[in-house]
Amino acid sequence: MNLTKKIVSLAAAAALVAGAGAMAATPATAKPKPKTKGITVISFDKALAPVVSKIVAVAPAKASGTQLSFPVSKVVGNGVEHKGAIKVGAVEAKDPIIIINTETGGASVTLEIVGLSRMEVFTIKNFKIRSDDKKKQVWQGFLHLTSDPIVVAAFNQQIGAEVFKADMGLGQIRTTINK
């Protein structure tokens, strides 16, 4: 596989995984919590079921129907780190990190594309705390594909059709962090 095809394939896989990797975080002033537990669940729109069915979750990530889930591994500042990966064909994207921007109410999701580097694959709109009590904090928002034209083109190339568009809504994301 030539370098261009590999980059496009990896970017596409990352984009599909990132959605699953999107997670919640504590405010930017929070101290690192390396033993934090929790889970991020991505619920893709049912119209994307044929695409989502091509994603293979790599443990500890899990896939079920149109949902992907990733365990939270730690919270550092405004970043929520996860473990697990997804594969689409020969492309693997792993260890999603959700970076929350509390000023805008949004977040970005980056994934490490194996063989390349970490890149933003998804954005989260209206990512807010939905509940916060002594035991857990729940963040929820709307998962969108990044506006990066290279990532969008990579997704479309992976599935062989012009399905994805920049900033396209993909579904919902919910991150639960146990305190």
Model-derived features: where do they sit?
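Bacterial N-terminal signal peptides that target proteins for export
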Residues: M1-A11
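Compositionally biased, intrinsically disordered low-complexity segments
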Residues: L10-A11, A20-G21, V58-A61
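C-terminal segment of classical bacterial N-terminal signal peptides
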Residues: V17-P27
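N-terminal segment immediately downstream of the Sec signal-peptide cleavage site
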Residues: T26-G79, H144-K179
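Predominantly extracellular/secreted and cell-surface proteins with exposed
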Residues: V58-F122
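Extended amphipathic ligand-handling, pore-lining, and cofactor/metal-binding catalytic surfaces
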Residues: T110-V152
